[in-house]
Amino acid sequence: AGDGGTGTSSPITISSLTNGTAYTARVYAINAYGTSSASDASSSFTPSLPRAYFLGGTDGSNKTNAISYINMSTTGMDSIDFGDLAANQGNTTGCSSSTRGLVGSGLFWTGSTNSTVNTIQYITMTTSGSGQDFGDLTVARYEAGSFSNETRGVWFGGYAGGASNVIDYVTIASTGNASDFGNLLAANFSIQGTSGTTRGLMAGGYTNTRVNVIQYVTIASTADSTDFGDLSSVRSGVAGASSNTRALFANGFS
């Protein structure tokens, strides 16, 4: 229901709403003569705080199936349980639209054995729950990279008995197996990506040695990657972040 809000002019801020829940609002006036009748209900609105999600992972040889999140507009909070992946999964990578999160590739932990997987799972951002089956990547691998825009999720590179040069993609709003997008400049794993709405960048990684190459694709197309430039040093396992204007690559193994 929320705690409502007061004010002498528009807009009026309403507090204590639940993220992802639809609401309507009514307004009434209070003055020296009393309280008016409530207005008609407003159009439905759904508050949505920006969240960051964490899916699976590994600590040495121990894999986890945990999904958790934090609200990015707050500080000093621990992550909150969201649900579980289908199995303990590490060395995986994910991407998202504003409404869905996808996780694909990686290593499943089954007893004392790791198995490389091609599965893709998804969650609906505003509803806590476990990962649901989406489809399969074209190649089972781990230590792949990924990025997305609002429409497509893209995975590239990785390790599958050797480095892979495969780029494949899915339409995030649907479900189904990934389709071939093209190839990297060279087979590469421990590579990372980031993207704007139009371009996806892929940087660093390990071919037969660590590399400093940055390459790109146009996300709405299907084609092999194109050389973009170089990182300031050769390294694998970098972290990537971007806006629509600028991309940053940090850390990594040199």
PLM features: residue spans?
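Recognizes extended acidic, P/S/T-rich segments that occur
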Residues: 1-20, 32-33, 38
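Kelch-like beta-propeller repeat domains
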Residues: 31-33, 43-254
